[in-house]
Amino acid sequence: SWIEVDTSNLRGNSSRSMVAFNNKLYISTIDEALGGNTPLLYASEDPEFYRFTEIFPEGIKLEKGKNPTGGITNMAVFNNRLYACVSKDSGIEVWRTNSSKVQANDWTLVANNGFGDLANVSVLAVGVYKNHLYVSATKKLSSALILPQGFDLIRINKNDRWQLVAGGKAYIPAKTVNGSRGESISGFK
């Protein structure tokens, strides 16, 4: 049977991702009314018995460059770290915790600017396979329905270097950290 858990203290109106990490359940939410520009991330040791606590509570001073900069739409555990994917109009970002402890002001930017294509604004799926974290990078869904544009598949290694696995030339080229956009390693465009 199902058990309802108390989520009354969670801000936002849409849950995008859940992951278990170091004996806690993490959930990210998006506040669609605010445009999803605030990282809303919560943790609980056991939501049946303990309320979720906010990782980035209102009022905390978030240091620039040390925290996700928008709504977290996908998460994965990789290399004993929590990775958070941020979908935003200025291009996808991927962040990771600096240790196995998840806390504010202790994150590293792994990728930005949509992996070198500012048209990549959404992360729809992430997964770990053979020592790499794979991330799907998609264009704005409304325009992709009118003019099919495909998606990019990226892989990130344990040193946070990323490579284009499948995808073509950038629609809106941009510089990025920890990798550079070139030919896909699979040859698929």
Give the residues covered by each predicted segment.
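Trp- and S/T/G-rich repeat-edge/linker motifs of beta-rich repeat architectures
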Residues: S1-R16, A20, K24, I30-T73, ...
